[in-house]
């Protein structure tokens, strides 16, 4: 049939507007026919027709979406001709349709089942024409949706013939919906529509990982394992499409707690996680900033942090972007409830507010809270359960491989500009910097740089840089070693000054007993290093006063070369209350647990316990704390050697403390004249003739004196005139009861 000119009109009823049909008078065309509307030589549009008596003959009525799609205006003259579909080539097999709410005021977050939508669509629009780019209105569950046809594939001709599918798919521009056509819905960009079911396309999701991200250039040394564990626990589920996560019934991890010693990279790791994720800028909050002097403001500050995430989840549902909130020093606001003094209870209500926001009645699935602290023991346990800060990751001191990575990172720019001398061996520095944190390694590099710069500053009346030499500036191995020796000491390392004072006179090996103690100590050191079955080794050096127990303990600790050595001594706890003593001892042991290999010397145990024989009196609180610490095994992968000293083995036996030690080693006094003469010869304070005189008096006799007391007597006698020294020494020995002899 030849075409005719008709006039475009407005659709007469709302019901017909939802039919996706052009409306004519029955005098012009019949219902169910298809027409091609030509608005210009190159613009043709296919419509299915319906009839209605209110439409004037010679007019063809269109809904607003149809007029918008075809570019029609009311009263426009258009050319209309009948159109016939080739059923073998133009039946729709699969049609992809973009969907969104028609009116923004009707937006909700309810899930819409695409399977039911597809069935309703086929029922409403069966045997209708559809074109790529066509716009229409679709009513479902009393809601109006705007649809846009994105893609049409023709049905396989084999299926139409009743044969098995051949697998051939052909794209077409115009097609006819039939009973077994498939419809796939695709959510419009930035739409908050929540689609569920199988009749939806896989969304083109923006990758959660920044496409420009390079894991090798992240600038975090020594945290490879920790970072991969965090990625596995917290981000693996977020990389998958929402539909797969939904089918698995999987919930995303909402919180990570990073804890560990200061300067080990907690804040750096959190910052890099924020950069890695293709999300909005993380909100970084220092814990104390949350607190406010006005009533209710602290809780309001918590609510403000989560407001954006709540609003977006209400709008976009499962397709909401990720919101990252980083709490630095989270222990400042999340202490155990009920632990804070005062009547206001502000801290408790802040904790309650945070708990309810992370995982409360209205659950948010689009947040990631990263908390950082070096005091995880202070944090309320309700915050650490699964569903809140469930991924707990210790960021500990870096091992040798980690230190090598960190030093490479901090010296990379110097190497790139040839400012690092060829004699600098980064591997050597990594070995020498045991128990250095990442911040301390960075400080070491800065100190070496300042040492190198200082060489090129002229020491004159004015501070000037020698520019001639400055151009040849290089940081050398000597600069690093000088900084290591003088400037930077690890907080969790070995401070030689701690134990140097205990062995300032060296170790006097006056006989086999001393050698045996040192040999046994060396065996225990090797056991601690090499045995996987005994990560905790403890030994008690017991013996009479002044026998050199502390010096021997310090020597064993020094010879161990452990990266962490600490001496727990009563002279550092003078005036401490019982509670303060317990806390000081606990801190020493807690610090030891952070190192791979540690040695703690618990000196003069009876003094730590405040023991006095009159009464007798001792501190039971300190005793119980010490018993627990002596028996507590270090964390997995860490090893600890404890060396205790006491002059009152009998007292510790009564207190049942001896059983807390793995073994006990006796440190005797000098007991024979021969041992005394050996000690005098090693000390070298007396001349040969003087030693001969002393030998005549003590050889073959029993003596009883500690090496420490012997040193004191020798030094006193050396203050006399040379001819009286021996007589004075022997007299002092007699007065001290060190020998039964009556010296002349």
From Swiss-Prot:
Modification after translation (UniProt): Phosphorylation at Ser-569 interferes with homohexamerization.
Modified residues (N6-acetyllysine): 105
Localization per record: Cytoplasm
Keyword Magnesium: yes
Key words, A-Z: Acetylation, ATP-binding, Cytoplasm, Hydrolase, Magnesium, Metal-binding, Nucleotide-binding, Phosphoprotein, Protein transport, Repeat, Transport
Pfam families in the cross-refs: AAA (PF00004), AAA_lid_3 (PF17862), CDC48_2 (PF02933), CDC48_N (PF02359), NSF_ATPase_lid (PF21964)
Phosphotyrosine modifications at: 259
Species name: Rattus norvegicus
Origin organism lineage: Eukaryota, Metazoa, Chordata, Craniata, Vertebrata
Residue positions binding ATP: 505-510, 545-552
One example GO MF annotation: SNARE binding
Cofactor binding: number and manner: Binds 1 Mg(2+) ion per subunit.
Highest rank taxon of the organism: Eukaryota
UniProt-recorded name of the protein: Vesicle-fusing ATPase
Family under the similarity heading: Belongs to the AAA ATPase family.
Record EC number: 3.6.4.6
């Amino acid at each position: 049939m030849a075409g005719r000119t008709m006039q475009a009109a407005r659709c007469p009823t709302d019901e017909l507007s939802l039919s996706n049909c052009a409306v004519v008078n029955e005098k012009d065309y019949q219902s169910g026919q298809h027409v091609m509307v030509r608005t210009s030589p190159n613009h043709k549009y296919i419509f299915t027709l319906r009839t209605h008596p209110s439409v004037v003959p010679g007019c063809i009525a269109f809904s607003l979406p149809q007029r918008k799609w075809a570019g029609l205006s009311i009263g426009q003259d258009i050319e209309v001709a009948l159109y016939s579909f080739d059923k073998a080539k133009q039946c729709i097999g699969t049609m992809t349709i973009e969907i969104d709410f028609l009116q923004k005021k009707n937006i909700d977050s309810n899930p819409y089942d695409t399977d039911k939508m597809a069935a309703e669509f086929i029922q409403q629009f069966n045997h209708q024409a559809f074109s790529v780019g066509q716009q229409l209105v679709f009513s479902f569950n009393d809601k109006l949706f705007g649809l846009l046809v994105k893609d049409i594939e023709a049905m396989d001709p084999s299926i139409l013939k009743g044969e098995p599918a051949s697998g051939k798919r052909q794209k077409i521009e115009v097609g006819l919906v039939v009973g077994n056509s498939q419809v796939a819905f695709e959510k419009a960009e930035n739409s908050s529509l929540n689609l569920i079911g199988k009749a939806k396309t896989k969304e083109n999701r923006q990758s959660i990982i920044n496409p420009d991200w390079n894991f090798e250039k992240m600038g975090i040394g020594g945290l490879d394992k920790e970072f991969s564990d965090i990625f596995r626990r917290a981000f693996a589920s977020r990389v998958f499409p929402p539909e797969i996560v939904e089918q698995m019934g999987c919930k995303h991890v909402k919180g990570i707690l990073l804890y560990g010693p200061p300067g080990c990279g907690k804040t750096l790791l959190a910052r890099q996680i924020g950069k890695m994720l293709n999300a909005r800028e993380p909100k970084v909050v220092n814990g104390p900033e949350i607190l406010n002097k006005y009533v209710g403001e602290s809780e309001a500050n918590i609510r403000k942090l989560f407001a954006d995430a709540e609003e977006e989840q209400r709008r976009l549902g499962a397709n909401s972007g990720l919101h990252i909130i980083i709490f630095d020093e989270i222990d400042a606001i999340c202490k155990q409830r009920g632990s804070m003094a005062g009547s206001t209870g502000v801290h408790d209500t802040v904790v309650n507010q945070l708990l309810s926001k992370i995982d409360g009645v209205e659950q948010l699935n689009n947040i990631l809270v990263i908390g950082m602290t070096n005091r995880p023991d202070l944090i309320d346990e309700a915050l650490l359960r699964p569903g809140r800060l469930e991924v707990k990751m210790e960021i500990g001191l870096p091992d040798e491989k980690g230190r090598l990575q960190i030093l490479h990172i901090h010296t990379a720019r110097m190497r790139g500009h040839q400012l690092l001398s060829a004699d600098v061996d980064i591997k050597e520095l990594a070995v020498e910097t045991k128990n250095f944190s990442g911040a301390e390694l960075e400080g070491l590099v800065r100190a070496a740089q300042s040492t190198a710069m200082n060489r090129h500053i002229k020491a004159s009346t004015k501070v000037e840089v020698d520019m001639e030499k400055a151009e040849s500036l290089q940081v050398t191995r000597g600069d690093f070693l000088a900084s290591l020796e003088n400037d930077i000491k690890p907080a969790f390392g070995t401070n030689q000054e701690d134990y140097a004072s205990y062995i300032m006179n060296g170790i006097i090996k006056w006989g086999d007993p001393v050698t045996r103690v040192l040999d046994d100590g060396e065996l225990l050191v090797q056991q601690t290093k090499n045995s996987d079955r005994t990560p905790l080794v403890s030994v008690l050096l017991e013996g009479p006063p002044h026998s050199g127990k502390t010096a021997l303990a310090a020597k064993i600790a020094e010879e161990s070369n452990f990266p962490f050595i600490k001496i727990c001594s009563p002279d550092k706890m003078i005036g401490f209350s019982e509670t303060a003593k317990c806390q000081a001892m606990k801190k020493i042991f807690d610090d030891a647990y952070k190192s791979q290999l540690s040695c703690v010397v618990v000196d003069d145990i009876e003094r730590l316990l405040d023991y006095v024989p009159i009464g007798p009196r001792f501190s039971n609180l300190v005793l119980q704390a010490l018993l627990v610490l002596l028996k507590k095994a270090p964390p997995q992968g860490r090893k600890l050697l404890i060396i205790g000293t006491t002059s009152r083995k009998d007292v510790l036996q009564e207190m049942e403390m001896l059983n807390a030690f793995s073994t006990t080693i006796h440190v005797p006094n000098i007991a024979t004249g021969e041992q005394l003469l050996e000690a005098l010869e090693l000390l070298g304070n007396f001349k040969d003739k003087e030693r001969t005189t002393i030998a005549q008096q003590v050889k073959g006799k029993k003596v009883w004196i500690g090496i420490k007391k012997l040193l004191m007597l020798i030094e006193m006698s050396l203050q006399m005139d040379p001819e009286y020294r021996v007589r004075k020494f022997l007299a002092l020995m007699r007065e001290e009861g060190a020998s039964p002899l009556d010296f002349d």
